[in-house]
A protein has these predicted regions:
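Function-dense linear segments that define catalytic or interfacial modules
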Residues: 337, 393-422, 428, 433, ...
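Conserved "right-hand" nucleotidyltransferase catalytic core of DNA-directed polymerases
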Residues: 233-347, 360, 366-369, 429-607, ...
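Noncatalytic, basic helical substrate-engagement surface that gates or grips nucleic-acid strands
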Residues: 2-128, 132-158, 236-239, 245-253
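C-terminal polymerase-core module
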Residues: 489-496, 500-552, 719-767, 771-773, ...
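Non-catalytic nucleic-acid-binding/docking modules located in mid-to-C-terminal regions
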Residues: 50-54, 99, 140-143, 158-302, ...
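Short alpha-helix plus adjacent loop in nuclease-associated cores
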Residues: 71-85, 142-170, 227-229, 389-432
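Conserved RNase H-like, two-metal-ion catalytic cores of nucleic-acid enzymes
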Residues: 4-5, 9, 15-54, 70-71, ...
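Conserved catalytic core of nucleic-acid polymerases
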Residues: 470, 582-583, 587-590, 665-798, ...
Length: 855
């Protein structure tokens, strides 16, 4: 053995538990500590290149230290239940990974670490821990990787003898003398009363040990008060040294060769990680779920895998079954026939005629994955997809919107539906699992009451999104290029102005050089400093905006540079030959149910600044057409009124009064006619702040008032809208009881954060519990509206096309002679998407460009 890694299991697991956000399986079993621990040990193993590895754990039983001092570790809080549940699983998982797991009655994990380190011989030994006690073990052949938190971020510091000397001013073995004097409240080691870390460190740096100090207590040069304290607690000092000293000679096998890494049981590791729903970790460790799936259950034989090119025979079989389960990736198409898997080569000249015929057959139910891609394929063939009954990705998303992915094989592992195949190929195993997997997922969807969400919203929406992606959005290429040039000229002017104000040229895009210019050269007050230099983030610069004109110029420089690089240069790269941009519309990316847009993100075109809004001038209708733009008015507030049942809010909406003016009138105790624009603006911030779950601190920052003022605004709001206040309380309590929050259409978001030990994490969970039903319901409503608009356009044989969705806004490209009809259609379908206790209102406008239609 050349290198040995010795891990403090309890310490690393504990750090992972508090450092990783709460994670649970769908059944509620906590997994965050396990996830963090495996990742941390993996990184430590790679960093050290260890060929030997042992993980040490504490036992619950008392140790020899309790025999020395009854109060040792007294008062320490018990391990949180969510962490205790993960401890035995952690040990089993580490053993399956081929690591040596050690624990010994009467001793602590530290003693195991010390003994293995002391006897590591010629092997370089690294101790991985989050406990500084292990620093006493550092030597020329023993280093410590200390996991810590700095500025809210996890870091790992390597301690060599030199690093210990530099930080503490003493040799590593003398750290225990410092602890003997200062004590350790976390372990209830008493030390000498009144002696703190600074005094203890100074004494040991000068005199070397407590033995020397006490042997010469009356003659050494120390303050009289310190001498008195030392004399008074002499026995406690020596007891504390015994308690804090790691025993490096306990009765365990200390031969380094006994701890060589063993071959991992990859099947067991994969099974365990799949059961824990850690599918990203399976990928990261280079494992395959198919390796677990290929291990047959005792009663189950692997199914055969056969190549198929007799498409007439296959069609006859599928017609007879009345259903088909398949996975198509463009190269192969695999069919699960129950008793076998048939693999079709897509390059076979007979495949696509057969496949199109299958997709169009209204009598054969189709169960597959990513039906959006199939709709797109069929549209490209001038064909139709009929009777699409199941999509693994959409069903997985409906059941758990927080999952990392919805890959078929991963879902099979998650729902215990994996079927082994004779080939052992991952894709074959995924296909073989389809029937069993759909049965398991459909049963769960039915149990959750989510059939309407799946069958009336998500499955039909896939066809709409496919059409929108294929249609795309026309843009003015020359206009974007010219706008980018104008931005470039303005950016160059700003650069020159900044250099003139600072007095020299530097790289404006270098945070380090910018920090030096602002804080060293100009002498502005530094707010934050990182290990790489001064912080120059937006928050810091905005706080300095009135301190020097260069800061305003820098903020403008950043805004314009992003506008040019992201929205001018970026968009020019993705314009198709036909002058249209085609964004990918993602149906399974957000936890609230919202649709997202990527490659490029057209939902993120700037709207806050006049210059940003100008980008919308370059999104145009094709010749002879106009853009008809419709967006919901205050949909989230209307949803809040409905789900809270607040009488005042419902009345305000149904009376068609301005909700922000009404709120301002109540919050500021002012007749509506006397409400000023500033009052209305602040009331608007309160209205939407309640929806998004922000508190007084964030509201104060947003509207520029004191925290106490913001708190009064919120209290005034909740006094007037008492139904909202009750909803905010009740919905959190319900989420705590159920483990999830849900929309009016039964879309769920599971919230393990609500049971977290960390107060900040729990507070985050409560905010999500309050706003997810509002945001999620609004997202569901716009999806229903999209389906209604798309089907109505199709049903009435209109040439107009739905081309974009931006949160609460829909955009249709329509021939000029269809403009009025499409405008009326959009308004009607959006306002009648659902029936609430308050009416939905859609504002409709049109124009040649997105800017003209929306502004």
């Amino acid at each position: 053995m050349k290198k040995m890694l010795v891990v403090d299991g309890n310490s690393i697991l504990n750090r992972a538990f508090y450092g990783v956000r709460p994670l649970t399986t769908k059944d509620g079993f906590p997994t965050n500590a396990l996830y963090g621990m495996v990742n941390m040990i993996r990184k430590q193993t790679e960093a050290t290149g260890a060929d030997g590895l042992a993980v040490a754990f504490d036992l619950k039983a008392p140790t020899f230290r309790h025999g020395l001092y009854d109060a040792y570790k007294a008062g320490r809080r018990p391990m949180p239940e969510e962490l205790a549940e993960q401890l035995p699983v952690a040990k089993e998982l580490l053993a399956a990974k081929g690591f040596h797991v050690l624990e010994l009655a009467g001793y602590e994990a530290d003693d195991i670490l010390g003994t293995l380190a002391r006897h590591s011989g010629s092997a370089a030994c690294t101790i991985a821990t989050g406990d500084r006690d292990s620093l006493q073990l550092v030597s020329e052949s023993v280093n410590v990787l200390l996991a810590a938190t700095k500025m809210g971020r996890p870091v790992t510091d390597r301690y060599t003898p030199e690093a210990v000397r530099e930080k503490y001013g003493v040799e590593p073995e003398k750290l225990i003398d410092i602890k003997a004097l200062m004590g350790d409240s976390s372990d209830n080691i008493p030390g000498v009363a009144g002696i703190g870390e600074k005094t203890a460190g100074d004494l040991i740096a000068r005199f070397g040990s407590i033995e020397y100090i006490y042997d010469n207590i009356d003659t050494i040069d120390i303050k009289p008060g310190v001498r008195d304290k030392l004399k008074k607690d002499r026995d406690m000092a020596f007891l504390s040294k015994k308690l804090g000293t790691i025993n490096c000679d306990i009765p365990i096998d200390s031969d380094p060769q006994s701890y060589l890494l063993k071959a991992p049981d990859n099947f067991k590791v994969t099974r365990m990680l799949a059961d824990l729903e850690m599918f990203k970790l399976i990928d990261r460790l280079g494992l395959e779920i198919s390796s677990a799936a290929s291990e047959p259950r005792s009663e189950e034989k692997p199914v055969p895998v056969c190549a198929e090119d007799d498409f007439d025979q296959l069609m006859t079989r599928l017609k007879s079954d009345g259903e088909s389960y398949f996975l198509w990736d463009g190269e192969k198409c695999r069919f699960d026939l129950g008793d076998k898997v048939l693999v079709c080569d897509c390059e076979n000249e007979g495949f696509y005629p057969f496949f199109v015929k299958l997709l169009e057959d209204r009598n054969i139910k189709k169960y597959t994955a990513n039906i959006k891609s199939l709709y797109s394929f069929a549209q490209g063939c001038s064909a139709l997809c009929r009777n699409m009954c199941g999509d693994l990705e959409l069903e997985g998303y409906v059941l758990n919107p927080s999952a990392s992915s919805y890959d078929a094989l991963r879902l099979a592992g998650e729902y215990s539906a994996a079927v082994p195949t004779e080939s052992g190929d991952e894709n074959d195993c995924a296909a073989a699992s389809l029937r069993r997997l759909f049965a398991a997922m459909n049963k769960k969807i039915e149990e959750n009451g989510q059939q309407k969400l799946l069958y009336d919203i998500e499955l039909p929406l896939a066809r709409v999104l496919s059409s929108m992606e294929r249609t795309g959005f026309a843009v003015d290429r020359d206009g974007i290029a010219e706008f980018g040039s104008r931005l470039g000229e303005r950016i160059a002017d700003i650069e020159r102005e900044i250099y003139s104000l600072v007095g020299y040229e530097f790289n404006l895009n270098s945070p380090k050089q910018l920090g030096e210019a602002l804080f060293d050269k100009l002498g502005l007050p530094a707010k934050k400093k990182t290990k790489n230099g001064y912080s120059t983030d937006a928050q810091v610069l905005e706080s300095l905006e009135n301190k020097h004109p260069a800061v305003r110029d820098i903020l403008e420089y950043r805004t314009l540079s992003k506008l040019r690089s992201t929205y001018c240069d970026g968009l020019l790269k993705v314009i198709g030959e036909d002058g249209r941009i085609r964004s990918t519309l993602n149906q399974t990316e957000t936890r609230t149910g919202r649709i997202s847009s990527t490659e490029p993100n057209l939902q993120n075109i700037p709207v806050r600044s006049p210059l940003g809004r100008e980008m919308r001038k370059f999104f145009v209708a094709r010749p002879g057409c106009v853009l008809v733009d419709a967006d919901y008015s205050q949909i989230e507030l209307r949803v809040l009124a409905y789900i809270s049942g607040d009488a005042n809010m419902i009345k305000a909406f149904n009376d068609n009064t301005d909700i922000h003016t009404v709120t301002a009138s109540e919050v500021f105790d002012m007749p509506p006619q006397l409400v000023t624009p500033m009052m209305r603006s602040r009331a608007k911030a309160v209205n939407f702040g309640i929806v998004y779950g922000i508190g007084a601190f964030s509201l104060a920052k947003d509207i520029g008032v004191s925290r106490s003022e913001a708190d009064e605004y919120i209290k005034g709001y909740l006094r007037h809208y008492s139904g909202v206040d009750k909803y905010m309380h009740d919905v959190v309590e319900k989420a705590k009881k159920d483990g999830y929050a849900e929309t009016m259409f039964a879309r769920r978001r599971y919230l393990p954060e609500l049971t977290a030990s960390n107060a900040n994490t729990r507070a985050f969970g409560e905010r999500v519990a309050r706003n997810m039903p509002i945001q999620g319901t609004a997202a569901d409503i716009i999806k229903i509206a999209m389906i209604r608009v798309y089907e109505r356009l199709e049903r009435e044989n209109l040439a107009a096309k739905l081309i974009m969705q931006v949160h609460d806004e829909l955009i249709v490209e329509a021939p000029e002679n269809e403009k009025e009809r499409v405008s009326a259609l959009l308004k009607e379908e959006m306002e009648n998407a659902v029936r609430l206790s308050v009416g939905l209102v859609a504002d409709v406008h049109s124009g040649r460009t997105w800017y003209d239609a929306k502004g």
